[in-house]
Amino acid sequence: MRKLRCKQMIPKLLPFIFIYLSVANKIMFYCILNERAFKHYKTYRRITDCPEIKNKKSRRKNQRNSSSIGLSNPNKFSIYIYIYFFFYSFLCSPYLFKYISLF
């Protein structure tokens, strides 16, 4: 098997990297979107179903305090980053090792 130079290897390797990066981006975006939707739904259910919150003032106050739509805590965001890098490294590794072994 002939050895590939760097200039010959890069064009063959780039499509795989871009494909798997886009897959990992979609997975991470879906995870973050799911977390935001779940947080919003949880806040909405707490405001509408709680029997104690009947008058408008306390409902508005509760909405102001708890209606921030986003990630519930930063630890979950770091978990999503780890998942992202895991998928990226897991999916790209066979091709990377294949091309690196040709050197």
Curated annotation (Swiss-Prot):
Cellular location(s): Endoplasmic reticulum membrane
One Gene Ontology cellular component annotation held by this UniProt entry: endoplasmic reticulum
Stretches that traverse the bilayer: 13-33, 77-97
Keywords, ordered alphabetically: Endoplasmic reticulum, Membrane, Transmembrane, Transmembrane helix
Membrane topology category: Multi-pass membrane protein
Domain of life of the source: Eukaryota
Protein's UniProt name: Uncharacterized membrane protein PB8E5.08
Phylogenetic lineage: Eukaryota, Fungi, Dikarya, Ascomycota, Taphrinomycotina
